[in-house]
């Protein structure tokens, strides 16, 4: 959960305010760590909760309810003195599951292609592409303003698998 502190430190040093952090939620480990880091910054280091960016997980495998249960269990096991299962500090969207882990649709593939060709950002359809597409849609749907940070948590092997399976 030290990564959250690193993000906040980088933001301070570079005079950037992140209003939202988005990432894929699969096993729940990364979002659990970020949320634990946020709670630690608030309770131990005295950060105001209003200074902390909202953490948004885009589920790639589970329903939002099940993903949230897993994450809350993780949070409580990190440090029960700092965490409480009744408070979370994050939200989960399962609106982009496309039927579950490993499933995707043409919209996700179009997003992946656009990001690759316009920004040289490789995304895979199973994990990071689904999450990035979900982030774009959540920003549109909820009219989120400010700066959004997308945490690319991997998926490179899946990206290369996908690239090899595409027609030349």
Model regions and ranges:
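Glycine-rich phosphate/pyrophosphate-binding loop at beta-loop-alpha junctions
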Residues: 1-94, 98, 152-168
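Residues that mark the start of a beta-strand
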Residues: 20, 146-147
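Short, loop-centered acidic/histidine patches that primarily coordinate divalent metals
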Residues: 126-128, 151-154
């Amino acid at each position: 959960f030290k990564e959250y502190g690193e993000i906040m430190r980088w933001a301070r040093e570079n005079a950037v305010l992140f209003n939202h952090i988005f990432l894929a939620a699969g096993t729940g480990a990364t979002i659990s760590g970020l949320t634990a880091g946020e709670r630690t910054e608030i309770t131990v280091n005295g950060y105001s909760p209003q200074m902390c960016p909202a953490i948004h997980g885009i589920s790639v495998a589970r329903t939002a309810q099940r993903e949230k249960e897993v994450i809350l269990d993780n949070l409580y096991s990190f440090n029960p003195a700092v965490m409480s299962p009744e408070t979370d500090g994050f939200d989960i969207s399962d609106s982009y599951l496309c039927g579950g882990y490993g499933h995707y649709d043409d919209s996700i593939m179009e997003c992946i292609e656009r990001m690759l060709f316009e920004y040289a950002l490789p995304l895979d359809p199973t994990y990071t592409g689904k999450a990035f597409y979900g982030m774009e849609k959540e920003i549109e749907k909820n009219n989120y303003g400010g700066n959004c940070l997308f945490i690319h948590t991997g998926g490179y092997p899946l990206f290369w698998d996908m690239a090899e399976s595409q027609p030349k």
